Amino acid sequence: GLPQVPAAAHHQLAKDWLLRNGTSYHEDRELGTKRARAAILMELALPGSAYIYQGEELGLPEVADIPWDELEDPTAFNRVRDQIEKGRDGCRVPPPWKAGTPTFGFSPATKHEGAGVDASQAGDPCEKPHLPQPQWFADYAVDREDTDSGSMLNLYRKALGLRHEWMTADTTLTWLDCDRSSGKPDGAEGHTGGTIAFRRANGWASVTNFGAEPAELPAGDILLVSGPLTDDGRLPQDTTAWIALG
């Protein structure tokens, strides 16, 4: 199996928000979203349990610029060799439900009588969420993604529905003939590209293309793709397809 990734080194905090020369890191959200869509389909096709972290189902980026005086993660208040880290609060910001409300639907705009609120307080503004929500959260709100058939939220819904339908207790995984390395640095950030392609015991197959060249898909019925295929029906880079093999 794959080696364990040390959590302390790779999962606890955001990396590379400033380059070594102090300039701002270029965040390509369009490319990141494309890769995230491909990654979740590959993950959900694998045997075993799957975990979805808050906001992944919306394609919600981490909030990396929370003001220091509004952070809650103890990491932000600990100095190690004169270095300060913001911690993981950027992943804990209350998610957006409704685009047109003050707290994006996370909490009501005004207080209601009951549960510690007396009649004299009813109608007063509610407290702010425990972490600040940026205005761009409106673009990822559930009520907006709900009506967009191509949104990340609806991709998750389709994928989880198909996973429930196609998941088999047989955890056998067989590599397909199209599973191969490209043999050249045409993958993300100059890594070797290629295709990861496998099938489950019941004929459910997943193909993910990491290389620059579009990949041929095996014969069968396409169940779901993370993004558009090429005009001739091949799988572009950073895209996953689920197929019911013929």
Predicted features, each with a name:
Residues 1-220, 226-246:
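Active-site and adjacent substrate-binding regions of carbohydrate-active enzymes
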